[in-house]
Amino acid sequence: MVNYPHKLSSQKRQPSLSQPKNFANRGMSFEKMINATNDYYLSQGLAVIHKKPTPIQIVRVDYPQRSRAKIVEAYFRQASTTDYSGVYNGYYIDFEAKETKQKRAIPMKNFHPHQIQHMEQILAQQGICFVLLHFSSQQETYLLPAYDLIRFYHQDKGQKSMPLGYIREYGYEIKAGAFPQIPYLNVIKEHLLGGKTR
């Protein structure tokens, strides 16, 4: 049988028996969702939080054409601390964002000693510090306070990963929304500040 483009196929389609799919934020990376959330917070006058640039030292550049430069060799100037920082209602905010496809744990190799030390320094200065953890296969996002990450890091130094059970016990689930997409300020206000704002 010939199926012309303007004709409907005479074959009947079998209904799909697969699970319903969640197409919310499809194709958008976790980092882009956080950036969109931060843009929303800024536009609404709620917070000023930005992604920190990674300092890079450019060593060699090729010029294949006069108008085009191509960086061929570059190095990180220093180890990066955390991904985001800013101010919310007079409080200093500093956080790291991690995404994993794993279903039951987040790899601890994603957290480096200098990042843990940086988080300890933020907490010592009464700053608000945490990690946003996104399990992409389950579409679950959690805010884990830095002191719970630090405690796990020091207690279980040999562990290869932090179990999802630990994150669910000590962290706070963040339900994705439209505006903002990852409403983490709600968790900060309710759980880390006890409902108080300055």
Curated annotation (Swiss-Prot):
Residues 1-21 are annotated as: Disordered. CDD domains: RecU-like (cd22354). It holds the Pfam family RecU. Residues 11-21 have a biased composition (Polar residues). One of its GO terms (biological process) is chromosome segregation. Mg(2+) binds at T81, D83, E96, Q115. Keywords: Cytoplasm, DNA damage, DNA recombination, DNA repair, Endonuclease, Hydrolase, Magnesium, Metal-binding, Nuclease. Its EC number is 3.1.21.10. It is found in: Cytoplasm. Gene3D superfamilies: 3.40.1350.10. It is an enzyme of class 3 (hydrolase). Its main location: cytoplasm. It catalyses: Endonucleolytic cleavage at a junction such as a reciprocal single-stranded crossover between two homologous DNA duplexes (Holliday junction). Its cofactor is Mg(2+). GO terms for cellular component: cytoplasm. The record marks K98 as: Transition state stabilizer. Binds 1 Mg(2+) ion per subunit. InterPro entries: Resolv_RecU, Restrct_endonuc-II-like, tRNA_endonuc-like_dom_sf. One of its GO terms (molecular function) is nucleic acid binding. Endonuclease that resolves Holliday junction intermediates in genetic recombination. Cleaves mobile four-strand junctions by introducing symmetrical nicks in paired strands. Promotes annealing of linear ssDNA with homologous dsDNA. Required for DNA repair, homologous recombination and chromosome segregation. Belongs to the RecU family. This is Holliday junction resolvase RecU.
